[in-house]
Amino acid sequence: MKRLLLGLMILVSAARAAPEPASIVGEWWTPGFNARVRIEPCGEAVCGRIVWLWDEVPKGIVDKNPLIGRVVIDGMKSTQAGRWAGGRLYNPEDGRDYKGSLALRSPEQLVVDGCVLFICQTQVWRRADAARCPPVAMPPQ
């Protein structure tokens, strides 16, 4: 009986010690540190907005609307630990929305896939380090 109780206590403590999957909520740098995107919960999904740009109006951008505050990740729902799908990704370079998915490669790297039919493009975003990158205030909407 004592062995059974000891075994159960070990199992319960091991289950509690298991790390929770990392969250994508927070701020992320796009490749080349050209933009910073804040990912936050929105209902049962997550959404992401541009909170900082290297250039206010980057060259080659089709969309002439302001990009700061623009939603670029919309409606991504968790499909399994470390993966989100079912939402849309907005590409300011061509002004189009794409079917997308997100996956945590590590707590510091987010793989962002955008697809049209069977043609996909992948980017790896880096988590913005809060110690070196203070929070960016969003403009009023």
Regions found by a protein language model. Name each.
Residues I61, L110-L117:
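Short aromatic-glycine motifs in intrinsically disordered, low-complexity regions
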Residues M1-G7:
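Sec-dependent signal peptide recognition
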Residues V116-Q141:
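Edge beta-strand at a domain terminus
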Residues S106-E108:
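Residue-level recognition of beta-strand termini and adjacent short loop/turns
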Residues A18-G26:
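N-terminal helix-cap/turn-to-beta initiation motif at the start of protein domains
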